[in-house]
Design a protein with these regions (language model features):
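Rhodanese-like catalytic fold shared by cysteine-dependent sulfurtransferases
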Residues: 1-37, 41-77, 83-121
Length: 121
């Protein structure tokens, strides 16, 4: 999908402020046993079509409204993914503004996760 210039400017600006992790880094985090939550920020229809086993779903349209109910610990490590790493960067930026100190955007998103061989549902 080709993204608009305005959207890419917004995403690139957010990426200057957020921590990102690639799939290899996420798999290492997961293998280490370090506590974290994997959060799928895609739309409901994307989630229903398939997602990473064990992930929770909080779509980009509602995550800021619902995150504090679902994850009240602002120090929790949140690894956020979307389709390719754009929307998750925007979400990570907003969560940091809300006081979440370890919101991480997964670069490559769902596409990279599928290619990695992680268990899907």
């Amino acid at each position: 999908m080709k993204h608009s210039e305005g959207f890419l400017r917004l995403v690139n600006d957010a990426k200057t402020r957020v921590k990102q992790i690639d799939v290899a880094g996420y798999l290492a985090l997961r293998a280490s046993g370090a506590p974290h939550l994997l959060v799928d920020t895609r739309e409901e229809s994307e989630w229903a079509a398939g997602h990473v086993a064990g992930a929770i779903h909080l779509g980009k349209g509602i995550i800021e409204r619902d995150i504090e109910t679902r994850v009240p610990d602002h120090a929790a490590t949140l690894v956020l993914y979307c389709g390719g790493g754009y929307r998750s960067a925007l979400v990570a930026d907003n969560l940091q503004k809300m006081g979440y100190t370890s919101a991480i955007s997964l670069d490559g998103g769902w596409r990279a996760l599928k290619e990695s061989g992680v268990e899907l549902e």
